Design a protein with these regions (language model features):
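Macromolecular interaction modules
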Residues: 1-213
Length: 213
């Protein structure tokens, strides 16, 4: 995150009060082997209607930067965990030197498992590429991750932002891409927006609440 390559990310999704989560849960995960840093986040657009989630919605997100020694713990009641490893391709975007204070979290899977690599190639060489080229204000690095052990959601696109209004930045992204590739009724836009065997599992915006030292 920010100015470093993170081998893996472990996410926890919860409706628990964020102060309680930060006090009781964050230290327990940080104490595990392979965990380097933690941040915790507030969902700023819960129950969004434009991209309704397949995964259960949640209020707060814990993000743990982990290395290859990490093994995901059993999540306590009221918490759902997802362990992702950095995909072998690089992230795209810019490093501004400012802290990551906003996120756009995108979780996707292939409808047909046999097309997983085709979906991954589309995401890297078409979808994320055009977003990075659009230079969306507030957007920094966009990094691909793959779920450890397979299953759903298969891939994570982790959009880091240096703006404290991540939802506004997210909503500005598609119009800026349209300026580059064409309107929503063009083949170019459809190719960008609708990947092969794409199943959108979750999309939302998050604002940072706190971080470990």
């Amino acid at each position: 995150m920010e100015d470093r390559i993170t081998p893996g990310l472990y996410l926890e999704m919860t409706d628990r009060a964020i102060d309680e989560y930060a006090r009781d849960r964050v230290p327990a995960v940080l104490a595990r082997p392979g965990v380097q840093r933690a941040t915790w986040w507030r969902n700023v657009k819960r129950d969004r209607a434009d991209l309704p989630p397949v995964l259960p919605e949640f209020d707060h997100l814990g993000v743990y930067e982990v290395d290859d020694a990490f093994r995901a713990p059993e999540a306590p009641p009221g918490v759902t965990g997802h362990h992702f490893r950095h995909y072998r391709r690089p992230g795209q975007g810019i490093v501004t030197g400012r802290p990551t204070v906003g996120l756009s979290l995108v979780l996707i899977s292939p409808k047909d498992e046999s097309r997983a690599q085709e979906l991954r190639d589309w995401a890297d060489f078409v979808h994320i590429r055009h977003i990075a080229e659009a230079a969306v204000p507030g957007y920094c690095m966009i990094t691909p991750y793959e779920r450890v052990g397979g299953g759903d959601p298969r891939f994570m696109h982790f959009y880091e932002m240096d703006t404290d209004d991540p939802e506004r930045a997210f909503k500005s992204m598609t119009p800026l891409v349209i300026e580059r590739i064409g309107a929503t009724d063009t083949p170019e836009f459809r190719h960008w927006a609708f990947g092969p065997s794409l199943r959108i599992m979750y999309v939302n915006s998050f604002a940072r609440v706190g971080a470990s030292s």
